[in-house]
Swiss-Prot record:
Protein name: D-alanine--D-alanine ligase
Keyword Ligase: yes
Chain residues that bind Mg(2+) 1: 287, 300
InterPro entries per record: ATP-grasp, ATP_grasp_subdomain_1, D-Ala_lig_Van_CS, D_ala_D_ala, Dala_Dala_lig_C, Dala_Dala_lig_N, PreATP-grasp_dom_sf
Gene that this sequence comes from: ddl
Cross-referenced PROSITE patterns: ATP_GRASP (PS50975), DALA_DALA_LIGASE_1 (PS00843), DALA_DALA_LIGASE_2 (PS00844)
NCBIfam families from the UniProt entry: D_ala_D_alaTIGR, PRK01966.1-4, PRK01966.1-5
Length: 347
C-alpha cells in the first residue's frame, strides 16, 4: 500500500507565490511507485481548499490549483486534511507557514510532518531571536540593531549610526525570501526602509552591510544531522531581493562553491552547530556571508527553504548524490521518525 503525502501549499504570507512554485516541483519529483499525493491549498484569507490528488506522475500540462483556478465549493475545515498514516509536507514559506503556526496545528491533529517542530520553526523565523540564540552558541553574526514597534525611531536611527556604518539593510524580523528588505545609504533612505519593513512586521532588524559572497549549506537529519558542500549565489544585481530570486531570474549558482577546504569545514561545522542550537529537525538551509576580509558570518537559517527545481537546497543535495525524489523520501522518513519520538515522550 502506498504512503500518502498531504501537500499543503499557498498560505497567508507574502511568500505564497513561492510556495506554489515549490509545491509544483515537489509534486513532479515524488516517486509515485511509493507515494500518493493529496493537495490542499491555503488561501490568503486562511481557508483550506481541497484541490488535486495524484496517484501517478502528473503530465506537463498539469498545474496545481491556485486562487485563480480553485473550486471554492471544495472549501473544507482545516482538520479535513487528517488521514491516518499520512505524512504532511507543509511547503509553506514565511509567517503562518514555517513559523510554528502550522506545525502546532499538525501536532494537535497528531500527524507526522516534514520539517522543524514548533519551537525551532518559530525561533528560526524570527531573525532577531535567531541572532541572539546563535550568539550564545558562539557563532559570528553581522553587527545589528533591533528595532521594535513603539521604539523611538529617531533614537534608534542614532543608535544605528553610532554602532553601524552605511550602507545598512533593514529587514522585517519575521519574513523570508527577501520580502520587505531594502538597502540604505543614508539616514533618509533608512527612514523609508524602516517604514517598508514595518509594513510586514512589528520587529525590524537593521544589519551592517558587508561586501561579501553569499554561501549556502544544506542540512538534513533529525538527531544525526548531515550537511552539504556549500553552494554560492552568484548575482547579476547589487542586492539579492525577492524579484531577483523569483521573478527576474538574475542569479546563477556555483555548486560547489569555489572556496578553500578550510572555509568549507568552518561553514559546515557552524551550520550543523546552528541547527542543533535551535533544535532543528528534518531540514534547513543555512546562509552565510563570506567577506573579502575572510570573515564568515552566519546570516540566517531557513527551516523550509525553496523547493523549486532551481532552488539551492535540492541542488545542494543533488551535488551530494541525493536526487530530488530520494530527498523527498528521506524527508518523509525523517518526519515519521520525529513523530514517533514526539509521541513516545507523551508519557
Amino acid at each position: 500500500m502506498k504512503q500518502t503525502i498531504i501537500l499543503l501549499y499557498g498560505g497567508r504570507s507574502a511568500e505564497r507565490e513561492v510556495s506554489v512554485l515549490s509545491a509544483e516541483s515537489v509534486m513532479r519529483a515524488v516517486n509515485y511507485d511509493r507515494f500518493t499525493v493529496k493537495t490542499f491549498f491555503i488561501s490568503q484569507s486562511g481557508d483550506f481548499i481541497k484541490t488535486q490528488e495524484f496517484s501517478h506522475a502528473p503530465g506537463q500540462e498539469d498545474r496545481l490549483m491556485t486562487n485563480e483556478t480553485i473550486d471554492w465549493d471544495k472549501k473544507v475545515a482545516p482538520s479535513a486534511i487528517y488521514e491516518e498514516g499520512a505524512v504532511v509536507f507543509p511547503v509553506l514559506h514565511g509567517p503562518m507557514g514555517e513559523d510554528g503556526s502550522v506545525q502546532g496545528f499538525l501536532e494537535v491533529l497528531k500527524m507526522p510532518y516534514v520539517g522543524c517542530n514548533i519551537l525551532s520553526s518559530s525561533l528560526a523565523m524570527d531573525k532577531i531571536t535567531t541572532k541572539r540564540v546563535l550568539e550564545s552558541a558562539g557563532i559570528a553574526q553581522v553587527p545589528y540593531v533591533a528595532i521594535v514597534e513603539g521604539d523611538d525611531v529617531t533614537a534608534k536611527i542614532a543608535e544605528v549610526e553610532e554602532k553601524l556604518a552605511y550602507p545598512v539593510f533593514a529587514k522585517p524580523s519575521n519574513m523570508g525570501s527577501s520580502v520587505g528588505i531594502s538597502k540604505s545609504e543614508n539616514q533618509e533612505e533608512l527612514r523609508q526602509a524602516l517604514k517598508l519593513a514595518f509594513r510586514y512586521d512589528s520587529r525590524v532588524l537593521v544589519e551592517q552591510g558587508v561586501n561579501a559572497r553569499e554561501i549556502e549549506v544544506g542540512l538534513l537529519g533529525n538527531y544525526d544531522v548531515k550537511s552539504t558542500l556549500p553552494g554560492e549565489v552568484v548575482k547579476d544585481v547589487a542586492f539579492y531581493d525577492y524579484d531577483a530570486k523569483y521573478i527576474d531570474n538574475k542569479i546563477t549558482m556555483d555548486i560547489p562553491a569555489k572556496i578553500s577546504d578550510d572555509v568549507v569545514a568552518v561553514m559546515r561545522q557552524n551550520a550543523e552547530t546552528a541547527f542543533r542550537a535551535i533544535g532543528g529537525l528534518g531540514l534547513s538551509r543555512c546562509d552565510f556571508f563570506y567577506t573579502d576580509k575572510g570573515e564568515i558570518f552566519l546570516n540566517e537559517l531557513n527551516t523550509m527553504p525553496g523547493f523549486t527545481q532551481w532552488s539551492m537546497y535540492p541542488l545542494l543535495w543533488d551535488n551530494m548524490g541525493i536526487s530530488y525524489p530520494e530527498l523527498i523520501e528521506r524527508l518523509v522518513d525523517l518526519a515519521k521518525e520525529s513523530f514517533d519520538k514526539r509521541e513516545a515522550h507523551l508519557i
